[in-house]
């Protein structure tokens, strides 16, 4: 409320700028985004730059030995894995960056399944691991994690053609159907 009272004109001008940019976007058929200085930037170029920067960031953060991103505690980070599969598709799955993205995602998913994050008895995946090797799970399972991780495993199966990833997705679905519904 204080910002509205103190900076109302600035907020209204910002809103007007957004509306004008959306109008230009709609008028141009969505083919171009508008850069801050007004020069049109093709959307595929802007998306490519964003994916490239994101890919570099996650490549540097990736734990090549144990999979995942960063140290303990380690979470599945389904959105990062999803980003890596999208990045591979955008860059080309047969290119070096595409293969690197698939490799980071697949290594992470494989290490998660081999470690204590996957519950081989009850099915599904625990929320996170308290150690960097994925050995010691935090004994809690969340429905939303099951959904996101299952999608990651399905995409991994499609990208790598390794049946184990599809099997793990089915394991998650069976756990959810049996214990969480």
Regions found by a protein language model. Give the residues of each.
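Replace the tail clause
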Residues: 1-181
């Amino acid at each position: 409320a204080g910002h509205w009272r103190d900076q109302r004109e600035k907020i209204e001008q910002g809103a007007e700028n957004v509306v004008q940019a959306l109008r230009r976007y709609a008028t141009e058929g969505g083919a171009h985004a508008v850069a801050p200085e007004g020069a049109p930037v093709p959307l595929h170029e802007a998306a490519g730059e964003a994916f490239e920067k994101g890919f570099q960031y996650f490549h540097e953060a990736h734990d090549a030995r144990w999979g995942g991103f960063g140290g303990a505690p380690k979470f599945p980070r389904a959105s990062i894995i999803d980003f890596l599969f999208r990045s591979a598709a955008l860059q080309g799955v047969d290119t070096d960056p595409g293969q690197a993205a698939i490799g980071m995602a697949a290594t992470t998913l494989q290490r998660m399944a081999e470690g204590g994050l996957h519950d081989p008895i009850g099915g599904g995946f625990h929320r996170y691991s308290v150690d960097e090797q994925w050995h010691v799970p935090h004994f809690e399972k969340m429905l939303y994690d099951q959904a996101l991780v299952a999608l990651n495993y399905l995409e991994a199966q499609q990208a790598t053609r390794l049946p184990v990833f599809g099997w793990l997705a089915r394991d998650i679905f069976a756990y959810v159907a049996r214990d969480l519904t």
